[in-house]
Amino acid sequence: MSIMDERLLSGESAYEDADLEYSLRPQTLRQYIGQDKAKHNLEVFIEAAKMREETLDHVLLYGPPGLGKTTLANIIANEMGVNVRTTSGPAIERPGDLAAVLTSLQPGDVLFIDEIHRLHRSIEEVLYPAMEDFCLDIVIGKGPSARSVRLDLPPFTLVGATTRAGALSAPLRDRFGVLSRLEYYTVDQLSAIVERTAEVFEVEIDSLAALEIARRARGTPRIANRLLRRVRDFAQVRGNGTVTMEITQMALELLQVDKLGLDHIDHKLLLGIIEKFRGGPVGLETVSATIGEESHTIEDVYEPYLLQIGFLQRTPRGRIVTPLAYEHFGMEMPKV
């Protein structure tokens, strides 16, 4: 099992998150907290499409995991007053799988493809005419007698979500009329989300406790809600049920989540570079071997937050731990 699968601070969705996220999910843009730039633009594009009685242009949502891409896709469908059909890149293995989904759509529907960067190129080619001309080219028969038949599709909106926009092919990326990058949330925004989630849980929470959870949630709502669930457990077992500052600090310390939202994996990565490679530079593959995790997981899951808070640098020569990280661990940088 990958250590990411057990990680409390992973932005990736876990099985136990699914039902919770559905119950917490806002239904409209007005209810949606954060992502103001993306939200305001979508409000305009949706309203304009409704005024023209057209489908919304295809939308690409990209950014780190756990920031609300799936939630926004569902909100887009709600705001347009249409149904949403959800699938993912890995689930579409053959062109026929995509054809089955496309032909089941009703006029105006939203098709949400999560992890769209994982679509095979042969499937992307089927998607091009569907996105551009609302038609589907299928091949009937094999060999010399094979012929291509074009089927008309109802107008629809494709909403694609990805954590790796750069992995999309240029022809696919260019077919999206709306591109929205989702950013990490501020502490105040996350605190508001934590308090809203506490209301849904019917648990009392101090405003200072909500802020403390928000500060350690790595700018990610999914992590904030997950931390609140665990702190709530401590409040019920070790306290009187109210999530106080004292309970929150105790719980997060026992969960090995430090004041900046770093956990044992972050410590292992940073301290591994500091102690074994004098802070770097060190290559990604070497870091991978050092902590026993795949390089793409390090690059896509672990490093973004460390880069965001300035604890790590990516350079042509490799990864370098910054003075801020040394200061956080109470260590002195080696002299050159």
Swiss-Prot record:
UniProt record similarity statement: Belongs to the RuvB family.
Functional summary from the UniProt entry: The RuvA-RuvB-RuvC complex processes Holliday junction (HJ) DNA during genetic recombination and DNA repair, while the RuvA-RuvB complex plays an important role in the rescue of blocked DNA replication forks via replication fork reversal (RFR). RuvA specifically binds to HJ cruciform DNA, conferring on it an open structure. The RuvB hexamer acts as an ATP-dependent pump, pulling dsDNA into and through the RuvAB complex. RuvB forms 2 homohexamers on either side of HJ DNA bound by 1 or 2 RuvA tetramers; 4 subunits per hexamer contact DNA at a time.
GO terms for biological process, alphabetical: DNA recombination; DNA repair
InterPro entries linked to this entry: AAA+_ATPase, AAA_lid_4, DNA_helicase_Holl-junc_RuvB, P-loop_NTPase, RuvB-like_N, RuvB_C, WH-like_DNA-bd_sf, WH_DNA-bd_sf
Quaternary structure, from the entry: Homohexamer. Forms an RuvA(8)-RuvB(12)-Holliday junction (HJ) complex. HJ DNA is sandwiched between 2 RuvA tetramers; dsDNA enters through RuvA and exits via RuvB. An RuvB hexamer assembles on each DNA strand where it exits the tetramer. Each RuvB hexamer is contacted by two RuvA subunits (via domain III) on 2 adjacent RuvB subunits; this complex drives branch migration. In the full resolvosome a probable DNA-RuvA(4)-RuvB(12)-RuvC(2) complex forms which resolves the HJ.
Full protein name: Holliday junction branch migration complex subunit RuvB
A GO cellular component entry from the record: cytoplasm
Region called Small ATPAse domain (RuvB-S), residue ranges: 186-256
A Pfam family assignment: RuvB_C
